Amino acid sequence: MDYLDLGPYSSASGTVRLPGSKSISNRVLLLAALAEGDTTITNLLDSDDTRVMLDALGKLGVKLARDGDTCVVTGTRGAFTAKTADLFLGNAGTAVRPLTAALAINGGDYRVHGVPRMHERPIGDLVDGLRQIGAQIDYEQNEGFPPLRIKPGTISVDAPIRVRGDVSSQFLTALLMTLPLVKAKDGRTVVEIDGELISKPYIDITIRLMERFGVTVERDGWQRFVVPAGVRYRSPGRIMVEGDASSASYFLAAGALGGGPLRVEGVGRASIQGDVGFANALMQMGANVSMGDDWIEVRGIGHDHGKLDPIDMDFNLIPDAAMTIAVAALFASGTSTLRNIASWRVKETDRIAAMATELRKVGAIVEEGADYLVVTPPQRLTPNAAIDTYDDHRMAMCFSLVSLGGVPVRINDPKCVGKTFPDYFNRFAALAKA
C-alpha cells in the first residue's frame, strides 16, 4: 500500500489559493450543459469527481473545450443528444444524483454506475421522487442503490413531488435542477420535503446557481420549493467557480494549530458555500480568525496555554467541514461533542465509524453514536500512527493535521485526495514547518 509520512511539525503559516469548489464545479457543469448558449467556466476544479462528470457529459453529446482550469460548455438547450450511454461515475455523489434526474427526463436508455462504495450509497429517495413524475428507473442489483438502468418514461407533473430530506440534500438538488425542464399544467412544480432537510447550505448553493442560469426557485422555509416549469436555462456567458470551502477547513485549522498567520484565498464573506461557517466553529474554539470577501486568515489560538477550547455543536449545516473539527478536537483542553452528523454514515465511507477508529489510534477516547461523536483528547498524541483513509479524501486531509502536534503520522493511500484536491499534500507541506 502507498503511504505518506508527515511531520513532526511545530508551526504552519503562509498563503494558499484554493482549488475550485467541487460542489459548485459539478453543478455548474450540468447547468451549463442543459442551458441555451455557450458558458465559459473558470477556476473549474480538476479532480476525480469533476473528471467523471466531464466524461459523462461528453458521452451524452455535450461539446466541451478545456484549457487548464477553464472549460467552455456548449449547451444542449435542455436535451442530451445521445439517447444511449453507459456512464461510470466513480464515487461522485455530485455527479450520480443530479445526472440521474436529468437522464430520467431525457427519453433515452442509460446505465449509471460507479465504484463498489457508490453502489452502497443510497439513491432510493431520489428514484422514488422521479417515479412520481413517470420516470422509468430500475435497480440492477440492490433496491435503493446504484447501479441504475434508466429508460424512456412518460414524464408529467400533476401533483406536488414528495422527497425525503434527512438522508442527503443531493436528492433535492437533483430534482430542483431538472424540474424546470419538465412541463406542468399551471406552469410550476412543487417539491415538498418529508422530515428535516439536512445540509441546507448545499441547497442554497443549488438555488443560487440556478438563478445565475435564469431560473428562480421560490421556497417556503425549507419544507416547500416551487420551481418554474417548462422553461429553459440561459447561459450567463461566464461564471467563475469560487474556492472550495470544505478544502479551506484543513488550512484554517492548520493556522490555528500551527500558529499562523495562515491565509486561504478564494473564499470569504461573499462565499455562497455554507462551509465557510467552519471559521465560526474555529472561533468558538478560541482561534483568532479574520475574514474579507474572498479570504480568511487564522493566527493561532487566543490562549496562553495554546490549546483550543472544547466545542459542543450541531454540525448539520456543515457536515464535511465538521470532520476537520473532529481532528482539531485532539488539540482541545477538554471533551468535544459533534452532533447531528448522521449523514456521515452514507458518505464516501461510514465517516463516524472511520473517524472514531482513527482518532483512537492517536490516543483519543472516542464515543460514537448513530449521529454524534464525542472526542476526549489524549495528554499526548501517539506518534507514528498509521492512519487508514478508507478511499475517503477527507479522512486523508483531516489527519494530516495530527503532524502539527509535534508527532510524525503516516497517511495510508494518500492518493485518495485526488477525488477533490490532488495537490493537497504538496500545498500542506509548503506551509508546515518543523
Swiss-Prot record:
Against CDD domains, the record matches this protein to: EPSP_synthase (cd01556)
What NCBIfam families does this protein's entry cite? aroA
Give the family, as the similarity comment puts it: Belongs to the EPSP synthase family.
- Classification of source organism: Bacteria, Pseudomonadati, Pseudomonadota, Betaproteobacteria, Burkholderiales
Q: What is its EC number?
A: 2.5.1.19
> Which amino acids does the record list as binding 3-phosphoshikimate?
K22, S23, R27, S168, S169, Q170, S199, D320, K347
**Catalytic activity field:** 3-phosphoshikimate + phosphoenolpyruvate = 5-O-(1-carboxyvinyl)-3-phosphoshikimate + phosphate
Q: Where does phosphoenolpyruvate bind?
A: K22, G93, R121, Q170, R351, R394, K419
Principal place of residence: cytoplasm
Under the subunit heading, UniProt states: Monomer.
Q: Which GO terms describe its cellular component?
A: cytoplasm
Q: Does the keyword Cytoplasm apply?
A: yes
According to UniProt, the name of this protein is: 3-phosphoshikimate 1-carboxyvinyltransferase
Q: Which UniProt keywords apply?
A: Amino-acid biosynthesis, Aromatic amino acid biosynthesis, Cytoplasm, Transferase
